[in-house]
């Protein structure tokens, strides 16, 4: 008796089990969020429906910049290989969107074929028409870098209204479509000719809902002197501050991202450190891909909820018979007041609402009589997903991340940053002398010995109190000096002999020169007399 009640209750109590985060996101979207989107025509206003390929695809990196800022050369530098369809030159060369992806053989897949392939995440680009699809292709090639990530090369952004109109498709809208689905957006600027055209400003503004994905690269920085570089960097930050309206400062990487010799090598160390940081950021993408997809689904769910409230409010205000057209105009003009009313009634953050101007434009062409009234059950299902299902998936995300290596992307330029004499920081700081036969501290030991014998050694060793008097002269914080003491006291007897004291001073010098201290003492820094204990 009442078996239908018990089944329903049991279904609510038992959480759904997923094998992977991607499978969980796919099922949650199809079962809980998609019905809300379809009921309130979300896809006509904001973004096409997600497909299976959107949840399974590799992390993607989108490169955006004005012409001749080095976008295609940047890809060539990363993968260390020419790719089909690649054109490089000082004039506007890349006139297409090129998805550089892994494939068993080299080749090009045209846009019209790409958008009918269910294994690719590009099917919804069909909506931008033939003018765009004729300017879209996939360059396939076997490459170890592309095993882990895909890279989207874009046409160089030009100045002037003529070029914008002659494209034949909405360039900013296409970029916005990609921005929703990629894991990283890299904006490239040329340090030698810094200029932000009107179209580029519009493009950056179109990406404003994805600031967390944006990184900026100031490329070709080896072509200018240090003083000029500082001025260019300041001008870039000032320009970006006017376009990207966020309190946080966007991360800018400075360098020269190609394999040619540096024209002005003054800032070589800076460029190496910046390249290393950017590579680490890109290498982290596969590890963080599941979290990014989860975050994007949450953002989409919040927008879908707000959209449902907007559409149902408009439906509620519409008359049943007469004066529909005049009422529609009135509602569109007063959409800002409807936003405020929804914000108050449902305690929704202003940041969750879509652009007022864009929404007004889209509503002009809609038939309000086809809008649906509020259906609380659909909203409750999405609320339940956000409150419970997403929390369970977060646990799975952390588990999947812990099983992945920290740097998944390998091959190409990424191999050049690995261990070896040309690895970043090799032979510097605590690594100095790593390949020397002699103990690297030995060359300065006579100087340290003079200080050591003024500190009243007993049986060839000084106490911690006496060592502290000398070590604090470095003005380093006690936390740092405490770490240096632990590293230098190799035999852990609470005292320092002459070699250990020399080692402590060497580590102080390393820190004062701006290098990090090692977590454990490297073998080449162990004093010669202690090496037999190792």
Swiss-Prot record:
Ligand binding (ATP): 65-72, 220, 258
Domain of life: Eukaryota
Chain residue ranges for the region called G4 motif: 219-222
Modification sites for Phosphoserine: 355, 456
All copies of domain EH, residue ranges: 444-532
UniProt cross-references to InterPro entries, sorted A to Z: DUF5600, Dynamin_N, EF-hand-dom_pair, EF_Hand_1_Ca_BS, EF_hand_dom, EH_dom, EHD_N, G_DYNAMIN_dom
Domain EF-hand: 476-511
Ranges in coiled-coil conformation: 198-227
Modified positions (N-acetylmethionine) in chain numbering: 1
Pfam families reported in the protein's UniProt record: DUF5600 (PF18150), Dynamin_N (PF00350), EH (PF12763), EHD_N (PF16880)
G3 motif: annotated segments: 153-156
Keyword set, alphabetical order: Acetylation, ATP-binding, Calcium, Cell membrane, Cell projection, Cilium, Cilium biogenesis/degradation, Coiled coil, Endosome, Membrane, Metal-binding, Nucleotide-binding, Phosphoprotein, Protein transport, Transport
Residue ranges, annotated region (G5 motif): 243
Domain Dynamin-type G as annotated: residue spans: 55-286
Region G2 motif: start-end pairs: 91-92
Location of the region described as G1 motif in the Swiss-Prot/TrEMBL record: 65-72
GO cellular component, one term: recycling endosome membrane
Domain notes: The EH domain interacts with Asn-Pro-Phe (NPF) motifs of target proteins.
Function summary: ATP- and membrane-binding protein that controls membrane reorganization/tubulation upon ATP hydrolysis. In vitro causes vesiculation of endocytic membranes. Acts in early endocytic membrane fusion and membrane trafficking of recycling endosomes. Recruited to endosomal membranes upon nerve growth factor stimulation, indirectly regulates neurite outgrowth. Plays a role in myoblast fusion. Involved in the unidirectional retrograde dendritic transport of endocytosed BACE1 and in efficient sorting of BACE1 to axons implicating a function in neuronal APP processing.
Family: Belongs to the TRAFAC class dynamin-like GTPase superfamily. Dynamin/Fzo/YdjA family. EHD subfamily.
Subunit structure: Homooligomer, and heterooligomer with EHD2, EHD3 and EHD4, ATP-binding is required for heterooligomerization. Interacts (via EH domain) with MICALL1 (via NPF1 motif); the interaction is direct and recruits EHD1 to membranes. Interacts with RAB35; the interaction is indirect through MICALL1 and recruits EHD1 to membranes. Interacts (via EH domain) with PACSIN2 (via NPF motifs); regulates localization to tubular recycling endosome membranes. Interacts with PACSIN1. Interacts with RAB8A. Interacts with FER1L5 (via second C2 domain). Interacts with MYOF. Interacts with ZFYVE20.
The protein, known as: EH domain-containing protein 1
Annotated gene: EHD1
